[in-house]
Amino acid sequence: MAIRNKLYFASDFHLGTGTYASSREREDRLVRWLDMIKADAAEVFLMGDVFDFWFEYKTVVPRGYIRFLGKLAELSDAGIKLWFFKGNHDMWMFDYFEQELGATIISNELEIERSGKKFYLHHGDGLGPGDTFYKFLKGIFRSKLCQWLFARIHPNLGVGVANYWSRHSRKVNLSKPDSKPGEQEWLVTFCTQLLQTHFYDYLIFGHRHLPLDIKLNDKSRYINLGEWVTACSYAVFDGETVQLFYFEK
């Protein structure tokens, strides 16, 4: 029997985006991935935008994703620690996954130390220079007032409007020229500034949809997890180092 000692990191599944068939295919792929890692995973970090939209009403959650959630429950029941990070598409997670899966919900950053290595973990949205309009919107969307007002809307209307907004937001972002990976990558800028006052071996993010492994200095590396719409990339810490991998590619 394999020893469960590895940390797995993945983000930006965007379950629910595209057609029902494409989202279901992505979900089935994720279930196969979770089956694969179950043998040696100690902890699984799902680092934001797991869903293309998510809102927890008091007694209602979005339909679908039952195979994915069932597999997560299986991992949790087997003693594997689950972490859910809020992303910009699924920031309205509250306590459902804590109650049903025993997961820990992370709203912003998480700092951990494992096997003598220090990690800084964050979905990646709203960090670094620029993007001031999104940072303004994020403050509004995360406010208790905004969440309370949205909860007053019937799910048939509220979820429909939110899904439209999510699709529109993605089209706008895809139409923008992306920055080239390297020193000008905005999360690299954020990491460089952070490392002036703190030390981390690994700074791991999602959000950018770019699988990246960039050396920041002699001891620190920036890892971006990519996404699962096309790349199906993820990272693994085996107790010594972090590596990027691609599932079924």
Show the residue positions of the predicted features.
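Active-site-proximal loop/helix segment associated with metal-binding centers of metalloenzymes
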Residues: 124-186
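Short His-Asn-centered micro-motif
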Residues: 85-88, 108, 122, 205-206, ...
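Core catalytic region of metal-dependent phosphoesterases/phosphodiesterases
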Residues: 2-6, 10, 15-114
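Conserved hydrophobic/aromatic beta-strand scaffold that supports enzyme active sites
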Residues: 111, 121, 234-236
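Active-site environment of divalent metal-dependent phosphoester hydrolases
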Residues: 16-18, 52-55, 85-95, 127-129, ...
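Conserved beta-sheet core of the metallophosphoesterase superfamily
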Residues: 104, 125, 131-137, 183-247
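Active-site-proximal beta-strand elements of phosphoester/diester hydrolases
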Residues: 6-14, 118-125, 222-226
